[in-house]
Amino acid sequence: MKRPATRTFGILTSGGDCPGLNAAIRGVTKAAYWRYGMSIIGISHGYRGLIEGDARLLHPRDFDGILTRGGTILGTSREKPFKPDPGEKDSEAGSRKVEAIIENYHKLHLDCLVVLGGNGTHKTAYLLQQAGLNVIGLPKTIDNDIWGTDVTFGFHSAVDIATEAIDRLHSTAHAHNRVMVIEVMGHKAGWLALYAGIAGGGDIILIPEIPYDLAHIVHHLQTRQQRGKEFSIVVVAEGALSREESLMSKEERKKRRKKNRFPTKGYEVAHLIQEATGMETRVTVLGYLQRGGTPSPYDRLLATRFGTAAAELLYRGDYGKMVALRDGEVVAIPLGEVAEKLKTVPPDHPLIDTARAVGTCFGDGV
């Protein structure tokens, strides 16, 4: 075997945690260490650790036995080095952070930085590449909204968790003849609500990509009741928008929600349903439950595939790429193609049609 292009690389996890991070870390590090003989520097708490120089040499004992563990052994943060901190009027703080990252990258004698994260993480990775650093990305998020990959690790585990929650809510909704509103994550993309909503038999699914009208939701619930269905399940993505909200600017929506004083979109929808129909309505917000715990077998497999593919890129010196899954094959795509792009649910996605075919309502009157 020829000498690897990468001798030493740093690895960090950035952004929100999700199931599969440790499996991906394990995939990268085991392949890089045992197959290619590379040295690995673990960077704590995402980009913040690289700013502060919080890093250490990893040994096999560090990445053994972590395949099934949730969270991340490296810790994470939502540090965005190219953005000024809250209260900063200019970009000086951001510039200092970027300078610190570049300085510590060289102090640690890194040939490359491997980052595991979502959209913001990969945008930063691309900017660091533009600043002269070698970077490789691995896509993780339960939202499944990273452009360029068919699926991200963490997504399927979250679908499993949300679907199980919907299954459990069916029995209590049936027992009390209630409308149960369950809110799942998905601020700008409704993949999680769509997949879990269909798998869990949701009667109504509300996602950001399809603005809803309360009148259509009410009509669907009342029609179900007239047919003898005494309970209903409404699956709401946290970023779902009413038709009225979809025509507003971001700032206008913020003001409206602040005025309404509902803690989340799920509570707003539940309140409006009960007010309009008189049906007893309850809310469950899954929140961080969706991001925690043991990754599903699918996510362990996907994260391992992504990790070993990243090790291969390190070996070849094929930097500036994000590992992705396309049509069942693991590929590498340029970071520049990924940065600042979002993968949302197309309104004509086959799963939308599947859901409509079994009578699921999206609140749009179709």
From Swiss-Prot:
Mg(2+) binds at residue 119. Pathway: Carbohydrate degradation; glycolysis; D-glyceraldehyde 3-phosphate and glycerone phosphate from D-glucose: step 3/4. Keywords: ATP-binding, Cytoplasm, Glycolysis, Kinase, Magnesium, Metal-binding, Nucleotide-binding, Transferase. Its cofactor is Mg(2+). One of its GO terms (molecular function) is metal ion binding. Its EC number is 2.7.1.11. Residues 74-94 are annotated as: Disordered. Residues 77-94 have a biased composition (Basic and acidic residues). Signal peptide: none annotated. The active site is at residue 143. This is ATP-dependent 6-phosphofructokinase.
